[in-house]
C-alpha cells in the first residue's frame, strides 16, 4: 500500500487559457452507479423508454424517497449491471430537449421559502442527489438536517480552470443558489 503524506506537486509549467469554448455535441449521457455509494436502485424505466430531462429513472431502496432523474432527454439505451446484479449505469442516447417542469420561484420569493418547499423541489427534480454527507459521501436522507453545508467551487487538480471564469456571467444565479 502506498501512503502519501504531503501530496504531489507536478512540475508543469505554464497555465491553461482561461476561456470557455464549445465542445463537440454529446450524443450519450449516463448515470453511473459508482458515483452513489451504497445506492440500491429500484428502476422506473427500462431499455427503449423515451425520457425527458428530469424524468424519474430510479429511486434508492436504502434512502427512501430519493429520486434519480434523467440528465437529458432521449431514449434509454442501456441499463448495465455487473456481478450479482450490481447497478453500473443507465445510458441515455440524447434526442431532443424536452424537459419536465418543476416549481420556479422569483428572486423576491427566495428568502421567504420554507425549508420543506426547498427540500421537496430538490427531491422532485432529482437535484437532491447533488448533496453528499461526510465522511462517506452518500446522498443524505430526505428528513435529515445538516449542521453545515460546504460548497466546493475550487478544483484542486493540476491546471484546473479558474472558478471565477466558470461562474462568470452567472454570478447572480450562483449567489441566489446559496441563499
What is the role of each PLM region?
Residues 1-44, 59:
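N-terminal, Lys/Arg-enriched amphipathic/low-complexity engagement segments
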Residues 56-65, 83:
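Short, charged beta-turn/beta-strand-edge "cap" motif at the junction between a beta-strand
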Residues 80-179:
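Buried, small/hydrophobic-residue-enriched core segments of structured protein domains
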Residues 27-29, 41-43, 75, 88-90, ...:
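Structural beta-strand/beta-sheet cores of well-ordered domains, especially the beta-sheet scaffolds
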Residues 65-81:
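Short, compositionally biased
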Residues 46-59, 78:
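Short, well-structured beta-strand-loop connectors
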